[in-house]
């Protein structure tokens, strides 16, 4: 799997992910970019799960963003509906963490679109470790969103065997 973490703080929203791709118990690649900018660089998205499945979902999500003029929530809901109801899409195994200047969301193949508490997202096999680290840093430090994401990914990479220390991090200015 992987670790993707997103933090929103002090006018910034940041999503970061590690770069490890595994096949069974073998590391196949260590520098996969699991976090991308979409829709004219106004949306950032990260994936946990099968790489091919995730890239398919990125393409579909970008189309939904275009269709709905970049409205993140509407595009996310439409993707989740299609993902849940389409027979072929239902087989895709991935989770998406997406964010724009206004909202941070998790999109699942079960049709869920969740805006998490405190705009903190952590998904993938290292998600629980990254979430615990990010939450502690949010509650007990004045660190910025990027620093929290970097430190959380580092901690997850030290603990989770499916997460490495190659990080891709994207950030946007945030209204929330």
UniProtKB/Swiss-Prot annotation:
UniProt-listed Enzyme Commission number(s): 3.4.25.2
One GO term describing the cellular component: HslUV protease complex
Predominant localisation class: cytoplasm
A Pfam match: Proteasome
Gene3D superfamilies xref list: Glutamine Phosphoribosylpyrophosphate, subunit 1, domain 1
Activity regulation remarks: Allosterically activated by HslU binding.
Top EC category: hydrolase
Sorted UniProt keywords: Allosteric enzyme, Cytoplasm, Hydrolase, Metal-binding, Protease, Sodium, Threonine protease
Family, similarity comment: Belongs to the peptidase T1B family. HslV subfamily.
Quaternary structure, from the entry: A double ring-shaped homohexamer of HslV is capped on each side by a ring-shaped HslU homohexamer. The assembly of the HslU/HslV complex is dependent on binding of ATP.
Function of the protein: Protease subunit of a proteasome-like degradation complex believed to be a general protein degrading machinery.
Descriptive protein name: ATP-dependent protease subunit HslV
